[in-house]
């Protein structure tokens, strides 16, 4: 198939997935840059001021300008933590947009989130309300820095997966979210009680639908469970296990097969060992 034919096929799939009617030029731009801008993203960018920091374009509002130095500092921190865990990776361009809760919810299709990352759009969305700027400056980690650390870790993880020649949908969400929570918990004392929440089978929080359902159950905390699982892997097997899992997972050998080979435990036994580790 010619490159023109590939682009036309990509245009058809892009419009089907986004519900839009993108031009051939927009399709080609998204294909070659691996960065698609939705209509909402274009609108938010057009209404924002812009500051460039290395490979990150920061889009912010005038009333949030005081947060830029802290944003740059947090991006440096996120990069240091992510590269420490995952090693080197090509730092492709990424956008970070400050936005209100309504826009964040529209982009993420999730309620009650403070941050969002789309690997398809190559964009991080961070909730910032102008009235909270002074509070953020006083207690930055809980209000502001943690979501940036979390979402940047997603960016780094997906970059590492892409460079390994794999696809993100081969990896369970608890693994992806666990890495992000581990990075976001740096310099933080994590309080946990494995008896406080219902522990879910990891395979039930592997894909999107199961994850969304788990977020709605008051007796569960899939983010904490993901953190505990990834932290266990790091503490017991060392940080290199994350890259090993990424590099060895592929279409013919799935994540759970690789996990069992590395840990010597099928997933059910692995889950029990994680619980026993924290008890």
Regions found by a protein language model. Name each.
Residues 1-49, 279:
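N-terminal low-structure segments adjacent to metalloprotease catalytic domains
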Residues 42-45, 108-112, 194-200:
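Alpha-helical scaffolding within the catalytic cores
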């Amino acid at each position: 198939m010619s490159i023109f034919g590939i682009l036309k096929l990509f245009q058809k799939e892009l419009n089907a997935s986004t519900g839009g009617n993108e031009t051939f030029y927009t399709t080609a731009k998204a294909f070659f840059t691996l960065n698609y801008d939705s209509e909402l993203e274009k609108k938010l960018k057009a209404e924002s001021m812009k500051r460039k920091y290395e490979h990150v374009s920061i889009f912010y509002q005038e009333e949030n300008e005081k947060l830029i130095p802290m944003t740059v500092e947090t991006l440096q921190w996120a990069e240091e933590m992510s590269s420490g865990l995952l090693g080197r990776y090509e730092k492709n361009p990424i956008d970070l947009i400050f936005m209100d809760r309504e826009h964040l919810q529209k982009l993420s299709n999730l309620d009650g989130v403070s941050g969002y990352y789309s690997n398809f759009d190559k964009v991080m969305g961070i909730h910032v309300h102008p009235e909270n700027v002074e509070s953020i400056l006083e207690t930055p980690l809980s209000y502001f820095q943690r979501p940036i650390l979390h979402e940047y870790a997603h960016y780094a993880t997906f970059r590492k997966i892409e460079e390994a020649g794999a696809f993100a949908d081969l990896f369970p969400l608890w693994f992806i979210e666990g890495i992000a929570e581990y990075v976001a918990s740096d310099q933080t004392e994590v309080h946990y009680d494995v008896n406080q929440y219902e522990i879910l089978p990891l395979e039930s929080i592997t894909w999107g639908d199961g994850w969304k359902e788990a977020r709605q159950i008051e007796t569960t905390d899939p983010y904490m469970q993901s953190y505990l699982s990834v932290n266990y892997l790091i503490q017991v097997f060392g940080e290199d296990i994350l890259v090993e899992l990424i590099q060895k997972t592929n279409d013919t050998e799935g994540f759970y097969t690789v996990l069992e080979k590395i840990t010597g435990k099928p997933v059910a036994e692995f889950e029990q060992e994680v619980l026993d580790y924290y008890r």
